[in-house]
Amino acid sequence: MEDRGRETQMPVARYGGPFIMVRLFGQDGEANIQEQRLYELLSDPRSALGLDPGPLIAENLLLVALRGTNNDPRPQRQERARELALVGILLGNGEQGEHLGTESALEASGNNYVYAYGPDWMARPSTWSAEIQQFLRLLGATYVLRVEMGRQFGFEVHRSRPSFRQFQAINHLVLFDNALRKYDSGQVAAGFQRALLVAGPETADTRPDLRKLNEWVFGGRAAGGRQLADELKIVSALRDTYSGHLVLQPTETLDTWKVLSRDTRTAHSLEHGFIHAAGTIQANCPQLFMRRQHPGLFPFVSAIASSLGWYYQTATGPGADARAAARRQQAFQTRAAAECHAKSGVPVVAGFYRTINATLKGGEGLQPTMFNGELGAIKHQALDTVRYDYGHYLIMLGPFQPWSGLTAPPCPYAESSWAQAAVQTALELFSALYPAPCISGYARPPGPSAVIEHLGSLVPKGGLLLFLSHLPDDVKDGLGEMGPARATGPGMQQFVSSYFLNPACSNVFITVRQRGEKINGRTVLQALGRACDMAGCQHYVLGSTVPLGGLNFVNDLASPVSTAEMMDDFSPFFTVEFPPIQEEGARSPVPLDVDESMDISPSYELPWLSLESCLTSILSHPTVGSKEHLVRHTDRVSGGRVAQQPGVGPLDLPLADYAFVAHSQVWTRPGGAPPLPYRTWDRMTEKLLVSAKPGGENVKVSGTVITLGEQGYKVSLDLREGTRLAMAEALLNAAFAPILDPEDVLLTLHLHLDPRRADNSVVMEAMTAASDYARGLGVKLTFGSASCPETGSSASSFMTVVASVSAPGEFSGPLITPVLQKTGSLLIAVRCGDGKIQGGSLFEQLFSDVATTPRAPEALSLKNLFRAVQQLVKSGIVLSGHDISDGGLVTCLVEMALAGQRGVTITMPVASDYLPEMFAEHPGLVFEVEERSVGEVLQTLRSMNMYPAVLGRVGEQGPDQMFEVQHGPETVLRQSLRLLLGTWSSFASEQYECLRPDRINRSMHVSDYGYNEALAVSPLTGKNLSPRRLVTEPDPRCQVAVLCAPGTRGHESLLAAFTNAGCLCRRVFFREVRDNTFLDKYVGLAIGGVHGARDSALAGRATVALINRSPALRDAILKFLNRPDTFSVALGELGVQVLAGLGAVGSTDNPPAPGVEVNVQRSPLILAPNASGMFESRWLNISIPATTSSVMLRGLRGCVLPCWVQGSCLGLQFTNLGMPYVLQNAHQIACHFHSNGTDAWRFAMNYPRNPTEQGNIAGLCSRDGRHLALLCDPSLCTDFWQWEHIPPAFGHPTGCSPWTLMFQAAHLWSLRHGRPSE
């Protein structure tokens, strides 16, 4: 490549045609973390690698490959230049400034050293590249072959040029040990790879160990046909629906939003359905593996919540560099998974993180292993399928993107959330458009698998007839480019096997019947095609099922066969047999030896061990320490159903024991009373809605409780006892949850075992023991998945079992969390153990040389404890509570003190040996009660043969309060909460060192988060802070369209917020709008949701460009925006960009008139990336100016309220630097990021209260106030049960929050100012 933006013609290599390569440069302003680390190393005069460099200069480097040559005719060159400009526009270039240009800030001359690097052009495009290419394809671009974003940095060298040792450092720190590539001048002259293809192995890896384990557990030849999972499951047939080991829990309150409804009176209904919890454990697991594995169990399941957990080897090594490298790898792998889930529109509500030292049993050879659980909702009619038969169509959903280094840091090839979101939306729409049984095959292999294994799982008999012209475009193009010598049967078979059948991919495969009655005028294939078209989901009709075995390919490249002709008789051009099941000879498993010679390691008796030193080591251990670097950087609340996510208390600390996911967020009247007539709104005003006294309604929220339990190290020590301890942890995590009936608790076990170390009898014994234990606990049990370490990792003895609890729940008051509530209350502990150090405990791992056998408590004692505490919770006696798990009793108490930010004084009896008492991990609970209730609680527990202990007292609130432990007259520990919080957060701080820029990590404001207590609620003071819940029929005079862009999810909160405000709400997909009158019947337009693309700013600009590309859609929206009787609201990153790009907000001008093209370059603002460089999920203060013109915020003027703020680009940059002042004077600023003070001028200026540190504006409105765009999302917190923490100013409300007023105000405004649309 040549420098400085000059076009360089490249000869043909991998790409089979002429092309030119263009370099564009964009000043980034600061070096990234890796470049800064390298520069510090090279500039350190004490380092052997020191170069005495000049100032570091860094910039982005965009490489664009374009079809053609400079000798092409002028029209072609003009079109190529237009597409190149389009790439720049999508990446932020505007009329008033360019973020990318041809001039570089670096000069590769003299003593300047310049280093350019990025994704490998000789490998498949990165995920970011694939997604921008998808946008360009939708926008009609044909000349852009590939786009990659790299980096370039440089500095002046005063000494010698970099040597081999310096290049080694660059390779390790910047290139991640060759995961990225150095770009040399002319490097791509050798060609580049355009296609999203990865060559698979010569033969598909059938994972015989994985297949064998699944046959043992779920039935098959290796198990002699027995299905242990079915034999050992414990369910109640009266309460559950199940097929095999899959257990479905029924519900009557699933939100259903109709698609293309012809009923003008309703668009929402509550339907019967089922809830299903699924999960799997996989080594080096694809980030979104469970998202497509779940449809392999139930094809029309909709994910509503997920959970993540990780197992890593402790970051150790011969030196600090090795440990830092291990920490960096872990940080990037977990970040990639967290951000993939953050972009998927499904909230992550539970998780864990465990490290095991390589010197311990189970730690040697441990590969990064991830647990991914998912809670899905299924409509009752969506369970029906048809019998598999010949003559059914084979369908592949989603773009074909074979895996390549998914988990290799810095993860440029991580999975595309956009692709998975589109697939899930397409399946949901397909179910609605064709509500009749039609799917005959949907099974998937149990682990990450090649395409040929997926196809084999679909076919219980016979084989498949596939057509080459219907294969994915990249595969088909590769076949078309084969020369005559290779375009033979064997040659094509080799190519198809290498690039289609043998690679692993992220697609969903199903078979559907050919015939069937038309529904709504559509056949099955037509309905599926329409659903994929609306969802923006690529799909391929690959062929059909046939009696002939194997995969039979028809060469129809010259004359493509239509889908209607696929059922005709064809002669295969070549046939590929399904891979044979590899049978292994019998071999003795490695014995699971455990040293049971000791009950307690003597190491804890050493005089140098003190409570304070032990506590410091345990609180800073990754297994116990804060996981805020994960929880606060993934989606926690999208969709609006989450009532309890991991963060609790005024500091939003990730300490919740359980999650609660509501089945519906749409209001109903108490007692099942019918809704009021919609004409009730005619008598309403904002004043009446705010000042109306609460009606004493006991609002109940029903949903599902989710918890996790895992004891990976203890399972490695003793499979049976470790499994029981995981079950105990999952159950006790649910002890304080609002469970309707303890008998409805469902425990699902996910096994991760190695058949080479545990044979069939060992697995059967462990499963039988688990079944017996569940029966003793009085809960239901099923087995969800079985997996094993990767083939080749024979050195690893790691095994684990993850237990998940799901149970129907219901609450009407505040949820019980670890947040201490009241000064002077008492703490009571109840444990199921003898007070000795538990075998396999974290204390033993850190301070003992001997691994002792763990012991699980008796099932009866655990059952009594769980049910007794559930009874106390229902009686209202318990104020807060937490389970005793990793780190023992003292860790539990510290976490409760930190969650509530209250001092605690603990008193241990003189006669006790307090050290083992403090760190014993025997399952138990600690809970807070008022002093007047202690006698009743103790009597209740003792009557059930439990022995509670009153541990101490809760103190005052504040970060400088003390946590004290007294052993008789001696104070053995006294530390401030501020110091304990720093220790507990130290692991997260280490991870942040690899993830956030140094200037953020070292900022004095980085810990200024939470305490959103001081609220300026003057407009609501003296009035009911919970607005009235007015439940009416949908008002046909106020119809609101929720615009759903392709690739987006999470619109349910917007739909529910407007429905609860009495509006008639419908989803509108881009492809539905076919003329400019489509929106004429609507008075409201809402834009929101989460886009699956990795680059949020790119997704927003591309969405505006897609709207502009469709004249009908563009003119319908512009016509709507210009009508004086309409309002619009845009929430979140995507919504703000779309409304600003359409000209509705961000300037004092009106939107363009219908028929006028929208110029994306003229957008008055662009989104600024977060200062952390990470996705943020924060509970932040938002202030609404008293003078804002917004009609929706009229009732909240002057308020400071907390709100959910989520995204990667949460700041506004105006192309006109003076525009903020113009908008302020025109009263068009809708809200600001605010500090924790009440003064109107105390805006937040620093991260994290201001995520980008780019100004403080968080929302804008139009000049007349009708159009509103907010970076925060009030639809996620319209009810108080959706709030992360309720400030004391609100007391203990259970109704709707002040944010409800903005949606009710929109309804009232439309009735007063709008044109009735009835």
Swiss-Prot record:
SMART domains: GATase_5. The keyword Disulfide bond does not apply. Changing residue 390 to A: About 90% loss of co-localization with host DAXX in PML bodies. GO terms for biological process: intracellular transport of virus; purine nucleotide biosynthetic process. GO terms for cellular component: host cell; host cell nucleus; viral tegument. InterPro entries: Class_I_gatase-like, Herpes_virus_tegument, PurM-like_C_dom, PurM-like_C_sf, PurM-like_N_sf, Tegument_herpes_virus_N. Its main location: virion. The keyword Transit peptide does not apply. It comes from the Viruses. Keywords: Host nucleus, Host-virus interaction, Late protein, Virion, Virion tegument. One of its GO terms (molecular function) is phosphoribosylformylglycinamidine synthase activity. It is found in: Virion tegument; Host nucleus. Pfam families: AIRS_C, GATase_5, Tegument_dsDNA. Disulfide bonds: none annotated. Tegument protein that plays a role in the inhibition of host intrinsic defenses to promote viral early gene activation. Interacts with host DAXX and thereby disrupts the complex between DAXX and ATRX. Suppresses the DAXX-ATRX dependent deposition of histone H3.3 on viral chromatin allowing viral transcription. Targets also host SMC5/6 for proteasomal degradation in a CUL7 and calpain-dependent manner to support nuclear membrane-less replication compartment formation and lytic virus replication. Interacts with host DAXX; this interaction disrupts the chromatin remodeling complex ATRX:DAXX and thus allows viral transcription. Interacts with host SMC6; this interaction targets SMC5-SMC6 complex for proteasomal degradation. Belongs to the herpesviridae MTP family. This is Major tegument protein. It comes from Epstein-Barr virus (strain AG876) (HHV-4).
